[in-house]
């Protein structure tokens, strides 16, 4: 292919600005905002979007997947157990059986977030990176959206006002920090919300409590993944991720039920 490439600077800049403006105009009022593009957040996004729910995922870093990429201590594999393996199979992720452990599978720690993120995007979810949620919209004792800022502006310590995204529901899938529910508790002490944080590692207990702890913790605000265990003082579990995927799916199902009943 020897054809001349077109590279006009003005056209490039105009294209970026117009497409970005159009995107933001479409995203300032959505059904669900998911804060944190880790395993549970991406899973929730996939199931919500494929059911026609207008979903945007906000991630402070420039990549999605949370801690999945690093596997276990940098070794490039994660473990997932039945029945969560079906969630990964739906996304076309290859799983290897663990000899002597019929309930366990290993998966490539790069393939998993890559394909799960693509599955969420293909389902219709929008993932925005480099965006941090610094506060919540709180109206009449209900979370009604998020207050957002550029992560680079926050890191630079610049005093620049944020903008907002309105939503029917917000999901805190920010992992161990549970930053969304912690922000709600810190800024609105009259609500009496306490976030005890997660306990030390007990994989079996941690995994089995994740779906149970996945729920609406304040009107309009759900927790899933490690944020759910942090809110309920559950145990951590290490590089086994089945509970995370099941938690994300359950969170999506809970919101779908709410939307259907409205």
UniProtKB/Swiss-Prot annotation:
Subunit structure, interactors included: Homooctamer; tetramer of dimers.
Recorded family membership: Belongs to the THI4 family.
GO molecular function, one term: iron ion binding
UniProt protein name: Thiamine thiazole synthase
Domain of life: Archaea
Its biological purpose: Involved in the biosynthesis of the thiazole moiety of thiamine. Catalyzes the conversion of NAD and glycine to adenosine diphosphate 5-(2-hydroxyethyl)-4-methylthiazole-2-carboxylate (ADT), an adenylated thiazole intermediate, using free sulfide as a source of sulfur.
GO BP terms in the entry: thiamine biosynthetic process; thiamine diphosphate biosynthetic process; thiazole biosynthetic process
Binding site for glycine: 236
Keyword set, alphabetical order: Iron, Metal-binding, NAD, Thiamine biosynthesis, Transferase
Gene name per UniProt: thi4
One Pfam entry name: Thi4
HAMAP family per UniProt: Thi4
Requisite cofactors: Fe(2+)
Organism taxonomic ancestry: Archaea, Methanobacteriati, Methanobacteriota, Methanomada group, Methanococci
Catalysed reaction, written as an equation: hydrogen sulfide + glycine + NAD(+) = ADP-5-ethyl-4-methylthiazole-2-carboxylate + nicotinamide + 3 H2O + H(+)
């Amino acid at each position: 292919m020897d054809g001349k490439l077109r590279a006009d600077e003005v056209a490039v800049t105009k294209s970026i600005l117009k497409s970005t403006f159009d995107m933001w105009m479409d995203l300032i009022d959505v059904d669900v905002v998911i804060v944190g593009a880790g395993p549970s957040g991406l899973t929730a996004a996939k199931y919500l979007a494929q059911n026609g729910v207008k979903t945007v995922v906000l991630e402070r870093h420039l990549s999605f997947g949370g801690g999945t990429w690093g596997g276990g201590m940098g070794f490039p594999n994660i473990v997932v157990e039945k029945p969560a393996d079906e969630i990964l199979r739906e996304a076309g992720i290859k799983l290897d059986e663990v000899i002597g452990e019929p309930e366990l599978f290993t998966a490539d720690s790069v393939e998993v977030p890559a394909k799960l993120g693509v599955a969420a995007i293909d389902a219709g979810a929008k993932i925005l990176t480099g965006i941090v949620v610094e506060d919540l919209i709180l109206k009449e004792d209900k979370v009604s959206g998020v207050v957002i800022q550029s992560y680079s502006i926050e890191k630079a310590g610049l005093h620049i006002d944020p903008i907002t995204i309105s939503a029917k529901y917000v999901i805190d899938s920010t992992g161990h920090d549970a930053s969304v529910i912690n922000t709600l508790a810190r800024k609105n002490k009259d609500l009496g919300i306490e976030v005890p944080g997660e306990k030390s590692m007990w994989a079996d207990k941690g995994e089995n409590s994740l779906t149970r702890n996945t729920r609406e913790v304040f009107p309009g605000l759900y927790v899933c993944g490690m944020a759910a265990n942090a809110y309920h003082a559950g145990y951590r579990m290490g590089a086994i991720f089945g509970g995370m995927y099941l938690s994300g799916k359950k969170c999506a199902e809970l919101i779908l039920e709410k939307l259907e009943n409205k």
